[in-house]
Amino acid sequence: MTTDVQFSSQEIELFRVKEFLIANNPAKINNENKDAVLTQIEHDFRYLIQYIKDGLPNLNESTRLIFPDTFSICLLRSHQIIASKKIDSQEFLSAVKEQLLTEANANIIFEYVLDFWADGGAPLMNALRDLFSKLLNLLKITYPMSTLKDVLFNWMNEILEVPSTLRVQYYLIDALSSDFDLYYIIEKKPHFIDNSFSLMNSDLLANSVGKCIVSLLLNIYEKHFKKNESFVQEWIQLWKSCALKYIHDKQYTKSINLYIMIPLFKNMPNSAFTLFLECMSNKDPSLLLSLLKIGQELGIEEEPFCDNKYTTVDSVNKLIEQDEYKLQVFEILTFSTKKSKPIRPFVFKTIKQYLYVFFVDTELERRNYFCSSMKHFIFRTRDCAYSLARDARKLKKAEKFPDEQREKLAQVEEARAFLVWLCNFIKYNLAPGTLYQANVTSLKLMHILIKSGVDKSTPQKFLDNQNKREYPFSIPILQDVTFLRLLIDLLVSNYADVRELSKEMLFIMISADESRGLFLDTLDANALKWTATSLLSDYEKGDAGATVYEFIFTVMGSQRSFIDQTIDILAQMVQNLQNDSIGCAENSIGPHFAALSLILNKFNSEENHQDTSKIISKLINLVLKSWEATRNVVCHDSAHGILPEKYANCGVPDQVIISHAFRAIKEASYLLETILKKYPLTRDQLDSIGDLFIVQLSTIRHSGAFQAVLPGLKAFCIRCQLEFPAILEELLSKSVKSLKSKTQHITRRSGGLPFLVTTVLSAEVTKGRPLLQKTFENLLLVARLPIPPHQDEFDLPQVNAINCINAIFVEPKLSVHCTSFVSEALELALLNFDCDIWALRNCSIMLFTSLQNRIFGKVGRSVSAKLFFTKYSGLRQLLLNILNSSIAQYSGSERKSYQIESIFLVLNVLLRLRPTAGYTGLKEFNVSVYECLSNENWKIRDMASRVLHMLSENFEEEIRKLLDLASIAKQNQLHGHLLALQQLVPQYLSGTRDMELIQRILEKKRMLLLENKCFITKKAYLKLTCCILETCDIPDSILKDYISTLRNTFIAENNEYVVDGSKQLYLAQILDMLLKYEDSIYLDDICLLGLYSPFYEAQLSTLQYMNTNFHWETTRNSEFLEQLQLLLRVPDLLPMAKALVVKILSRKKNTLSLTTCTDLLKTNNSEDTKLAAVSSLSAKLSSQTFHQVWNLLQGFFADSCSKDFRLASLECLTAYPESCKNSRILLQLYNFLWDDDSEIREKASFYLNKNFIQTADWEYNRNTSVTALIFTKKFVDVFTSSEVVEELCLQLFQYLNEYDMFAAEESAKNCLFTIEKDNQFINELQKAMHILNMIKLTGRDISKCYKDQIHHLKSALLEHFNTEDFKDSPLGWCSNAEIFSRITLLKELIQHYSPSDYENFINVLTKHSVHPLIISYSQL
């Protein structure tokens, strides 16, 4: 590759034409230069037309784009000249009409657009679309429509013959839709609209198809029906059934609404929308809601839920209870095109009633969509309140309509009350122990409320400046101490986004003048700092500690001293690690670096300019010292262990030492990133940072650590690009030189060098990317260096260069700039396929894979062979040479495994190419592909069979050729041919019923099944015949003859047991076919043969069939029962088979005894077998066995049990007919509503809604939280006995007492990760409140033992307060979710069951500053 780009003569001429056309805008043409310019444009027009006529010679990647762009400009200039009033263009117009744009030439251009669109990428398609648009414009100004109509009509006919999966068809129809009546399309192609709708689930086609359908239908309404509204109904009938057919499918709904319904109804009379709604035969809620939303947005239906116009308020409530519809309902309920329009009271009421269903949503996309909708509603509420208050003031000032004034002010108060309620609701969902999704949603809504200006103390910079309006009231969010406590508590959340959102809210709070002083008086900075320090010393909580540190720094007055103290602590830690690398291996250096990084982001360097340089200097030195202290751990490279020998038996686990070291490097890199982005640095400091990155990327032995270094490296490169670009060139120069170094101990992917090269190159902003060009050339030079004899195979510079080239193509920021290098890189990869050195082959294969993904895209996609080999000239011969060479060498005496790799990779390329009509370049590969079909490697034969299928143009001819060559004397060849036939035959027979060929294949059964001794090729033949039977209807006589042969073969082979896996699979295949195609009267015999078979694969196939198809009504059930019970007792029966036996036996009443099930569960059986046993227990449930079965199942209800067992136990309960009458079972099903797994929650909810709550069938899938709430009321209506109250109390007090609130918290030693609860979904406090509410609703008192427990716990709590001289604070004792929920529950219990103690209890809580939300907590 040379630095001077070489252009072909065509490219040079196209560039000249393009530059000339751009330079000669008609506005610049005058009488003096007119003749010369117009003559030249005519000449260029002729040249461009002739270029198409000549077949576009020397077409390459560049020319493919330059040509249509140039021609578009030519057509545009021609149109501008003819349309110009300043130029006499009659002579030019005549030339265009008679010589340049004749009908024949217009057709040539059209054909060019049509041909090249199919295989073009997005840039080419855009260029061709522009070209066609300019062509149409020029034709319309050149010819009258009466003349042009025939040409366009012929084009339309040709367009309609284009495959429907190509976008060009839809674009061209859309482009022609304004020129004539397109109703004839429906007449000519009656299924066109239906076929078009069927493609609306394709992301690639939806936009183009949608525009086409809209243009077509609008054209028909305007030109065929003459915009006559009386024909709207008839117009709807043309497409209604097609729309309704697909719009119900979720894959289609969104795209049909977006690309068809909205633009269609937007351009039609409102009556069209109304009539479409009325003629809907199926009132599907989802469809109705989506259409009502469209009507709202278009201003056709403003408030569709009002006055029961389309549905009742009760139906709206039921719809919002279901996850499938809740977002649509909420959006319609809260949306208005007139934002200041008063909000109806039922809207506020419905939102209050059902807002919680959005806060428990586990789907991120739905939560984000809800937050967006809620934002619009909050701002609408603000605008509405503002408008109402303004109008009330005007009326008051005018002293008019006092009743209307009161009504408007009442509506303002209603809005204020709703927002106050919303703030309280948010508080409850920020409480310790609430779900992650509730936390995130609450924080986002809190942010929206603050941005909307609901608190007038909010600083201006935090308000939303779009459509600014002021509330006529203020809600003091920023001065609320409960919000302050909740937000500080969330700073230690395990979730980074929760910490960030909380931190953002706190920053707004302390920025407000009215709240800053209040909070500083409230907060105990020293206690917070102690907590933060404690968190920083804990590896798993280090990020939380760093976040708290940042918060303390933000509220502290003396920021410089705080930074100095933190630096001193960190410096001491680093020094200690250097002095005692074992004793201090667990020092929290990483978290302290993280804390400093966050602090520096908030540090005001401009106000502390003199101190900043000293701080930065200290920090850079600390980073360098930390690296020196940890490098012996992360750079250790030895076969004797992952750590240096001195760490052996040191008492600290290796993983802990490594994790602390890597984290120190990662957090130090983030600190450097902060410094590089924000603070001034000298050239020397930049050099030292750059040297550090080079050393780290060159010596670290762990790929994860490379990723840790990258943030800092990226910031470094961007900084250098702005200030010292020469540093980057030096870095690249050093990197390329280091490729050849033998002291690197490079890993097989070249360590951190590719990261270094790509990161530096990504920072380049110079036009043309000269640094990328130069680096790529240098890398290619290194990669192409000849390898001397006896070269070290593990330290090749060529390997490192190829890995760097691969990294460049993979890096998203660089890949777009590498198009011109693809051909050379592909050639480089291919040339090394058959290299002797594994490392070089391996890196070349990785490069090839990256390039293949770039060229072909997703797996399964293919490109035209002609286009591919035209685009990458020279590759066809290279691929052919490699394939032939590898086959020849592999067939010789010295066989090497890498030759198999070469064959496989070339075949993989061929598999992605599809034949092009008239192109013969693939035919030379056929001979080699046939040779590959005989290769001794199974994978090569398999790949070759699929390639042959892709290359074949005449399937019938290929099939007959393969059959003719089939012989059992050559088993590899036979196998390859059978695999190829498996690919070719089904596709051929799908288009024709060639019975002669089918009979010919089936007649080979004697040779291939009876005479053949190889079970692998026998099985391949069976699979081929199976494909035929699945594809075609075979005459009964032929089918019976073939199945009879299979039956006899199975009986004969099944009697002779040998240890042979291929025979096992072969017999299983025969058995599968017999069970599928054998006459039903023989099926019992076949199944029994399979069960008695000594081959486990045959047994397994039989059991799998019986599991789904066998019924115990058979007359031979005793034989089956005997054999299945016998199998159950076989000690070494396959676990999978044993599980199937249990499932089949469980379907026969009284076959599996309770004792047998118990034994299966208690003995050492597989999980599948135990699951089958659990599922079968439902049949054993009765009033007599309930306690025994219940005790067995209880072990599987727990959250600690696997999901499969919990699900099996749920299904066992729901299969029991009496479950909906048994209070204990119903309570367990209620518990399943809080399960960690959504499938279990939904199944429990479905059962309860259907069988216990007994709702309408379309309500069975309501939200599980709604079901839980409804259940609590329904349950106590049905069950009110003292036994039920006892069961509820048992659950409630078990939860209350299972956690010891007063025990000292223990931290796990050497713990690197937070130990999560088994159930991440349950809100334990909310569930406890549900149970307490059920107890209250029964109207029964609780027993004395439970009241004693309440008294005892209350006394213990008060004693703890007094003994410990207790005072709670943010991040304090009550911030623990377990403690918070239990004190809150205790408060509720005291209030209800010991009311005389309640006031004193609250006073004590208040005195000790207990979490304010505990005191104010009540059920919404």
UniProtKB/Swiss-Prot annotation:
PANTHER family membership: DUF2428 DOMAIN-CONTAINING PROTEIN (PTHR14387:SF0), THADA/DEATH RECEPTOR INTERACTING PROTEIN (PTHR14387)
Family affiliation: Belongs to the THADA family.
Its biological purpose: Together with methyltransferase TRM7, methylates the 2'-O-ribose of nucleotides at position 32 of the anticodon loop of substrate tRNAs.
Anything else known: Present with 7110 molecules/cell in log phase SD medium.
InterPro entries in the record: ARM-type_fold, THADA-like_TPR, THADA-like_TPR_C, THADA/TRM732_DUF2428, tRNA_methyltransferase_THADA
A Pfam family assignment: DUF2428
Region Required for activity, annotated ranges: 748-754
The keyword Cytoplasm is assigned to this record: yes
Gene Ontology biological process: tRNA methylation; tRNA nucleoside ribose methylation; wobble position ribose methylation
UniProt-recorded name of the protein: tRNA (32-2'-O)-methyltransferase regulator TRM732
Major localization listed first in the record, in broad terms: cytoplasm
Disulphide bridges, residue numbers: none
Record note on quaternary structure: Interacts with TRM7; for 2'-O-methylation of position 32 in substrate tRNAs.
